[in-house]
């Protein structure tokens, strides 16, 4: 399978990407159902946004109290609550991911253990279990962030599982990945940049 978007173009759009990520994606992207330029551009734009330009393969939860109030208002409804959790990533994860995605309550520690990792930032005990089943071998959540091949495969699994290659809309794909439209402007910008460039 040939990538419809060249490595030169990829490097222009994601200049700080981890070395080898383009090759790792190229080797797997067809398994995600991304066989044309539009589908590949969508995959790269969304994964590029989720991983901070293919730099971070682990969710950053080091929020200020104001960031918590703005991003996770449901879990931090007032400044006093937000200030108790400020700059405490493990406590933040355990609160925002408690009792959902297969995780236990806040005290279980599941939120931190199963926080977002990989290109697509898979999150939650249920998603990690489903990914392990698809992969056909047992892995620990921490293995995903430290292994480029696994980081790419989480995105391939997620893309295939949720049939994202069939959604020809940045907004629709973003909602499936994010649950809302966080970062929609950047996602659209990346997608357009990947689509307008010619194969070098």
Curated annotation (Swiss-Prot):
One of its GO terms (biological process) is chitin catabolic process. InterPro entries: Cell_Wall_Dynamics_Protein, Glyco_hydro_19_cat, Lysozyme-like_dom_sf. Belongs to the glycosyl hydrolase 19 family. It comes from Haemophilus influenzae (strain ATCC 51907 / DSM 11121 / KW20 / Rd). One of its GO terms (molecular function) is chitinase activity. It comes from the Bacteria. This is Glycosyl hydrolase family 19 domain-containing protein HI_1415. Coiled coil: none annotated.
